[in-house]
Amino acid sequence: TQTSHPAKFHVEGEVYCNVCHSRNLINELSERMAGAQVQLDCKDDSKKVIYSIGGETDQDGVYRLPVVGYHEDCEIKLVKSSRPDCSEIPKLAKGTIQTSKVDLSKNTTITEKTRHVKPLSFRAKTDAPGC
């Protein structure tokens, strides 16, 4: 008989410092951020967080979070910047913070054990030269 083991994944993404305060988008001037803290939260149908894990970016601004089990409604959010000059978490139109959704559900066509998410960025307090 086959034993049932929980699914094991890694969620991987990048964190940048967006040195152009006036732009919300990552661009050619954006800098990868080492030591930034991120958090993965997965919620149930009532929007209650049922799975959560935090992590930190490496020297290349990349984080890799281990995940056990299938989860619905998951997203990565920025928690803390490693740079005092670039610590603002951008807000979206409705005042919510920027997040990256990730599919960790059982009902997906994604078969890779590493799930890649879109990059996130902190915003600098002022524009750098060239913005």
Curated annotation (Swiss-Prot):
Glycans are attached at residue 107. Exists in two variants: glycosylated and non-glycosylated. Carries a complex, major N-linked glycan, with a alpha-1,3-fucose residue in its structure and probably also a beta-1,2-xylose. The average modification of molecular mass due to glycosylation is approximately 969 Da. Disulfide bonds join 17-86, 20-131, 42-74. It comes from Plantago lanceolata. It comes from the Eukaryota. Keywords: Allergen, Disulfide bond, Glycoprotein, Metal-binding, Secreted, Zinc. GO terms for cellular component: extracellular region. Zn(2+) binds at residues 21, 45, 73, 88. It holds the Pfam family Pollen_Ole_e_1. Its main location: secreted. This is Major pollen allergen Pla l 1. Belongs to the Ole e I family. The keyword Zinc applies. It is found in: Secreted. The keyword Manganese does not apply. GO terms for molecular function: zinc ion binding.
